[in-house]
Amino acid sequence: MASDLDPSTVVVHAGRPERVPNAPVGESPVFSSTYVAGGDRGYGRFGNDAWTALEETLGQLEGGRGVTFASGMAAVAAVCDLVPVGGRIVAPQHAYSGVLALLDQQAEAGRLTVDRLNIADTEAVVQAVTGADMLWIESPTNPAMEVADIPALAAAGRQTGATVVVDNTFATPLLQQPLSLGADIVMHSATKFISGHSDVVLGAVITADDDLWTAIELRRRSLGAIPGPMEAWLGLRGLRTLALRLERAQSNAAFLAERLLRHPRVSRVRYPGLPDDPGHARAVAQMSGFGAILSIELGGDGDYAQRVCECTELWVHATSLGGVESMLERRRRWPIEVPTIPEDLIRLAVGIEHPDDLWADLERALKTAT
């Protein structure tokens, strides 16, 4: 495939079967636990055509080689396992709570040590990365929406020998390519925007370093953290429409952010697309769009925020994101969420519905819950 194609074209055409007479236009799931001897697969845990197609597509979008996993957390666990026993990871203070919980568990078990900092504080992170084995970046962060200076942090990681990992779930490969910004590894919860329909659980890791790719693929193979063929195929099918879905969802998010900024019950809107947002300048520098996730705060009233989530009719009160339907939740309803996330913070994962309908439902909930 030509290297000068727009990512919105690559996402449609990458990973398809060779165009020969009578070949299928698209890849199909292969339901087999083993293969006839003589090839490089040998067993179902070693490869599947549906994985290969998804990995090839994600690899072309991110600029590396992909490895898919049974879930985003399986991908996280495989990457963290690259850190030697007794090693140290520098991680964000705010990030997906499942990742932070896993790091805490490994630290408590004596497997490694973890330093958690404000990932938007570049100077502090650069100082902390000296002597670290891995720097874990999430940008924008979940759910605080902080934006890291990926090029500066990646450069610091290279200088000190730390492996730099970027969780690109919120931005997707269409809005941000961390490998081109200097990262060593990029990972996704492909459950979210990649698959895009809230019907499959998947993870993915992409790297341009052959040694890292081999080490990560070996961990997937050894741990058995493989995606099922149907799940991989659903992920690929969803990925084909990412450009269209993201364009609409991002437009909706920007529309809602502006409306919410003026609402009397909303004390803060966290969205890097807003010119006054602390992460706006960085987002402009390293992203081609601001994404479809935003968070709002409601004057410190956690009970009110919870009632808002329970009063919506169109917005789904659920804990995921990246699907075609809009979802919202108060993140502190989860005991696992870090205590520095405000009690009244609601994360809005914006879908592809008509923006006027989304706003009317949200505005009604803000009023009804009072």
For the regions a protein language model found, what residue spans apply to each?
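PLP-dependent enzyme catalytic core of the Aspartate aminotransferase-like
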Residues: 150, 245, 310, 326-370
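A common structural junction motif
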Residues: 223-224, 311-322, 365-370
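Conserved N-terminal alpha-helix of the aminotransferase class I/II PLP-enzyme fold
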Residues: 27-30, 34-82, 98-107
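Short, well-ordered beta-strand elements within core beta-sheets of diverse protein domains
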Residues: 235-244, 291-299, 346-351
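Conserved PLP-enzyme active-site core in the AAT-like
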Residues: 2, 67-263
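Conserved small-domain helix->loop->beta segment predominantly found in fold-type I
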Residues: 254-313, 332-340
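Short conserved active-site loop signatures built around small residues
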Residues: 1-30
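Structural preference for beta-strand elements that scaffold enzyme active sites
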Residues: 134, 163, 185, 268, ...
